[in-house]
Amino acid sequence: MTQDIVILAAGKGSRMKSAFSKVLHKVGGIAMVRRVLTTASTLPESKLHLVVGHQGEQVEANCQDFSANIVWQNDPQGTGDALRRVAPFLQADGATLTLYGDVPLIRASTLEKMTALSNSNTLVLLTISLDNPTGYGRIVRNEQGKVTAIVEQKDASESQLAIKEVNTGILLAPNNHLQGWLAALTNNNAQGEYYLTDVIAMAARDGVDIVTVNPENEAEVAGVNDRVQLAALERELQNQQAVSLMQNGATLLDPSRIDIRGELTTGHDVIIDVNCIFEGKVVLGTGVEVGPNCHLKNCTIGDNTIIKSNTLIEESQVGEHCDIGPFARLRPGTQLANKAKIGNFVETKKAIIGEGSKVNHLSYIGDTEMGANVNVGAGTITCNYDGVNKHLTQVADNVFIGSNTSLVAPVQVAEGAMIAAGSTITKQVGENQLAFARARQTNKDNWPRPIKK
């Protein structure tokens, strides 16, 4: 059955006290509305509609890659009013699923349960029973247990306020009925708004079957109105992701101290120490160990690689059996072949480091192509920038570079060459040559040491 999916994202979100649209605030490193759009996009045969209003330009710009139909609601008058704005774009057949841009943890599996029950004479509601239902619309059922209406908190009687089953706001309605119901909505209520929930009573009146589905947990349908609720959902999501990683064979030394701000994929027997941040798309191979206080962003780490504490890796590719850190920084464009080693206080950028090569301490290697089994001494620098342009340093296999060497790019060092410590290399070094470029040492006898006055 074809579906229209409407995501409501027009609210002002004044309690967030922010210059940004509420739905653009992030949970797990991803804007809430993008999480909802991503989940909605998994449903087949669907057309997305995004209702925007307050700061709608921000929302539209942030979500343009989803190719959703943008519908403006500049003067919001309730959820029913939002659907009425979308009504001209709805397909004649099929059904319309209503979601919310500030309910970011809704699961595709829950929506699939709803769509499985959908047909031209059935309305599907997502409901949940809460110990404290304050603030939610109550689900009213008749003696046979059939849903007959949803009553909002401000319009509910005392007996209705005692009902624990509440409306989550998410519903799936057949389009052949929905158009008429939307046209018949009125704003005769305490808020003076057009409630989408009023279509439930209309469906019951018209003999349409009303069935309910429940989410897996309360967090799945929790909305965000302020930063306290945002923080609570952040913790919930991080806990869910931590549990999933452990169930898939990763060890987290403290599951409460990991932050995943994107997508983290791990092989078996991965070990992650405390206070690590994973941002964007990160892949950790089998047997990878990540020490404490590391930050990995948009990178792939090969099997059995060890990443020691306080290391930053960004937009890099790391091979198998590598050894990185502590206190190392791999900047965008770094590629480490298998068994490469990057030690403490080493920074790389747009650097290809060959198999078995070692940059053990206190070095900067940028815009470099380095072969296999190269040893780079402490304090070595590639001088890649002339003030205007970046230049390439090329180091072939089996090169030994002494400590405190400066390689002034563009420069090439051929296979098997050796560079003496303290050299500044500005010219090509040939195969198996020894290069030294430093001032001659002079020793003066009986030199008088300066005396403090």
UniProtKB/Swiss-Prot annotation:
E.C. number(s) listed in UniProt: 2.7.7.23, 2.3.1.157
Region (Linker): 228-248
GO biological process terms, semicolon-separated: cell morphogenesis; cell wall organization; lipid A biosynthetic process; peptidoglycan biosynthetic process; regulation of cell shape; UDP-N-acetylglucosamine biosynthetic process
Region (Pyrophosphorylase): 1-227
Entry keyword ATP-binding: no
Subcellular location: Cytoplasm
Needed co-factor(s): Mg(2+)
Residue span of region N-acetyltransferase: 249-453
Subunit annotation: Homotrimer.
Protein name per its UniProtKB record: Bifunctional protein GlmU
Species of origin: Marinomonas sp. (strain MWYL1)
Organism lineage string: Bacteria, Pseudomonadati, Pseudomonadota, Gammaproteobacteria, Oceanospirillales
